[in-house]
Amino acid sequence: MALQNKEEEKKKVKKLQKSYFDVLGICCTSEVPIIENILKSLDGVKEYSVIVPSRTVIVVHDSLLISPFQIAKALNEARLEANVRVNGETSFKNKWPSPFAVVSGLLLLLSFLKFVYSPLRWLAVAAVAAGIYPILAKAFASIKRPRIDINILVIITVIATLAMQDFMEAAAVVFLFTISDWLETRASYKATSVMQSLMSLAPQKAIIAETGEEVEVDEVKVDTVVAVKAGETIPIDGIVVDGNCEVDEKTLTGEAFPVPKQRDSTVWAGTINLNGYICVKTTSLAGDCVVAKMAKLVEEAQSSKTKSQRLIDKCSQYYTPAIILVSACVAIVPVIMKVHNLKHWFHLALVVLVSGCPCGLILSTPVATFCALTKAATSGLLIKSADYLDTLSKIKIVAFDKTGTITRGEFIVIDFKSLSRDINLRSLLYWVSSVESKSSHPMAATIVDYAKSVSVEPRPEEVEDYQNFPGEGIYGKIDGNDIFIGNKKIASRAGCSTVPEIEVDTKGGKTVGYVYVGERLAGFFNLSDACRSGVSQAMAELKSLGIKTAMLTGDNQAAAMHAQEQLGNVLDVVHGDLLPEDKSRIIQEFKKEGPTAMVGDGVNDAPALATADIGISMGISGSALATQTGNIILMSNDIRRIPQAVKLARRARRKVVENVCLSIILKAGILALAFAGHPLIWAAVLVDVGTCLLVIFNSMLLLREKKKIGNKKCYRASTSKLNGRKLEGDDDYVVDLEAGLLTKSGNGQCKSSCCGDKKNQENVVMMKPSSKTSSDHSHPGCCGDKKEEKVKPLVKDGCCSEKTRKSEGDMVSLSSCKKSSHVKHDLKMKGGSGCCASKNEKGKEVVAKSCCEKPKQQVESVGDCKSGHCEKKKQAEDIVVPVQIIGHALTHVEIELQTKETCKTSCCDSKEKVKETGLLLSSENTPYLEKGVLIKDEGNCKSGSENMGTVKQSCHEKGCSDEKQTGEITLASEEETDDQDCSSGCCVNEGTVKQSFDEKKHSVLVEKEGLDMETGFCCDAKLVCCGNTEGEVKEQCRLEIKKEEHCKSGCCGEEIQTGEITLVSEEETESTNCSTGCCVDKEEVTQTCHEKPASLVVSGLEVKKDEHCESSHRAVKVETCCKVKIPEACASKCRDRAKRHSGKSCCRSYAKELCSHRHHHHHHHHHHHVSA
């Protein structure tokens, strides 16, 4: 019986159809009651809504009782010009005015020749006759449904004007009125085309992966696997089960950059597969996918009205009858009083009558609201009602949840301990992870992943009686044990009256979770989380808008305060240890100060979201309940969209005020002109028409992008795999330029090697970190204009091989680091999501003077340079740059010079020369050394080099004694490349590491720790090719190019043969060219300077010419052993076109296998030679 009812319900739903109609006859809200009355009278119509600005009617009807064409026919009987809109259609049908308007206009124009030949004045009457039909038809339809509208008023005006023999005026009225209808339709189409394209994002067809059959998306069931080729739009929400690609989600979330997708990634209908072939297992029906829900929300929002709109609509009902009454009085009273010049009074009455249409006033609010809602939707913000847009413009306080809103919600398990002797750690972890598998909290997923990483497999099916206690924790029964997991408050649920005192680490914002087995505290765990990028920027923007910010979290106060510190103490109020009801209570208190918004993403936030004046829920990733409760939905996780939404709401409110004022002033102006003795009927019609158009065009300004103020930035071509690092949620104009800084050529354009396409650049500024000891100086010659205030993260996005990506912190694949014998313990410590991080990360700020040019002279830290050092006694400027020292500090030497910013020409005699003074504190007797750096003509930053901002230096420096030699190892600070490609992108230390060679003491001052912060593959591959002694890395590899097809390594030694690993970062592997993703410098061969045969080799000393080494020293060219040529090694394995998309992994695994084999073969050579 139940099954039968379900089947009947399904049939009933299938019979119901949603149809869209373009109704061109809608002028303003005065037509809405006419449409409603028509639709009410039709059998089979269940629901309907009218969107006035877009002239759209949406009808849900029984397809068996009434068809869309029958509904359109009923609307057209009232002369509403309705058409059924075909799915996905956004083209404008009426590209040209109606024939009535064209003929009427031509005849009116010819009638002006009456001054030459008077009988031609009758052409004006013909113009009236030619254009009056549409107006008459609409007026007749209005009379049938007794209602006075503008069409009836125009007919009365035309008849009266003709009666007074003002033929040209009557013709002008008819022509202006008929042409205005077309102009308004065209203007409103431009405003609505964006929204119509948004509504039809998802395709109507899908291809079944197994059979290749093309079917309607409505027929696709849940768990069906559909195929999506490159360039196609994803038809339905689902999970990728095969293949990988990049997806453009801009239309859905506002995300400007392509989002990489691989197996188990979620994809949404309406987003575009840019490259690659993927198979998607559907997770919802076509009508339930995110884009369909989004379209429904937008439709509901557009058909809703603000309070001001409802007030204007109510007033307009009385406005028109009142104007008709006034007009009648103006015409009749002078006749009764037998006033002279009755024609003037009749003209005046007609001007008043034509002013009786309040269309401009009525449209002033809905058009502005419509445009604002459209702009918000295309930016990844869904505002559920026009009223919420109005409220958002008045917001005074915004409160944020912490986990998943301010922070990423991507936790790392720092510690997991069992406190009970009879319960081992694995058993406890098994119970906890099994219960957590049933929770949707971000912490739960982290604990489940942690359990799997230590080979503990959770079994959620074994958990009984699962319960969730919002703000406290969760409960589940497994293996006969009652397991309670949560914060301190969960103790009371477990029946533990006194919480045992245990020492837990809450420093650094760690979140502590407690595990109770029955009434006994059995264990605890520590989790840490990081703030989202862009949050502090969003808070600063909200402050600049005069909005107070607050954080409300159920997490402990220490974690809350740590997040506040991470954000630079930008929040005004911070509350920790809150239950859901506590959040609601605090929101109530905030509301006393002014309208309050709450931003959250979880079940715990639902009560607070409902209590606030505006609830903003965090997007597609947010829980379903939060999305339902929120008044505004943030489709992405970028909090910077919130100040943007507030600005948009305030702009929309201003536009409404402007529109209302414009409408009233113009109407009042024409009436004042008429009463002042100039009653122009055609002018009154023109004002009526013009007001509507002005209101529409003024509102459409909301759809325009506001120009960003500031210098244009130089990017690589969008097709490059080496785009600048982009933080999560960054817009396309906010890009980390640290790795993307390139030179500018003399013609004011960035070089093509930097930008891909030449972008014009007037003011080119070098990015410079700020510090306490230095002010920001602009350095000419480098592209990029973003001045950073904080030391940048050490590693780029995408460095981890795991799914979860972080944009800051040290990142190395944990598995690769653990496997490598060369990486010391402190680099093997646990990082987040399988990433290594270094405990000894330090940032040093050092000062270098760039003013003086004479060797062996110390630069004074303050004041002018000594005479003769510079032209015109130019002021010495500090260059302060952070030196990142990873692992252990350098032995015995504090390096005080770093050539990150050598693009400085303002203080030297020659533009081709840069002087810097290095301070090496190896001993008291060491003199100050001055380094002369020559820069090539093409600009201060070398073109064609992926190693931005670094300049080669010779082995012997000016002012050095013969025994003292300095040099540098230059590592590429390049952006991330795709996934784990071996490339210059693997090198991540930001800047240059110096080494010093002291002959007298017969010792080499080198690093103790290799600076290997690469993706999993590169970490192993590069170390494979370098020698090792006693477990310490003595050399640092540097990939360089000798020819197009070779990548050279900078390891040294005659007997040591070092590796060359050439990988492609693009799908096409048959080309013989070495890709830019792999190589560092196309015109350079690194050589190694050996000081003495018996001494240890200092690797990485760069020698430009052989004469830099004395006769007893030899410059040895680096040869290659671990060579993987592209065509033979990779292309042969990837030649199958069906598997072409997996080419990169093929090449990578092959190279790794080959290189590892060679490494084992030559390992004893490495050891022997370096120990010599």
Curated annotation (Swiss-Prot):
Extracellular side: 116-118, 167, 338-345, 677-680
GO process terms (BP): cadmium ion transport; metal ion transport; response to cadmium ion; response to cobalt ion; response to metal ion; response to zinc ion; zinc ion transport
EC annotation from Swiss-Prot or TrEMBL: 7.2.2.12, 7.2.2.21
The HMA domain, residue ranges: 17-83
Reaction equations catalysed: Zn(2+)(in) + ATP + H2O = Zn(2+)(out) + ADP + phosphate + H(+); Cd(2+)(in) + ATP + H2O = Cd(2+)(out) + ADP + phosphate + H(+)
Keywords noted in UniProt: ATP-binding, Cadmium, Magnesium, Membrane, Metal-binding, Nucleotide-binding, Translocase, Transmembrane, Transmembrane helix, Zinc
One example GO MF annotation: ATP hydrolysis activity
Protein name: Putative cadmium/zinc-transporting ATPase HMA4
Organism whose genome encodes this protein: Arabidopsis thaliana
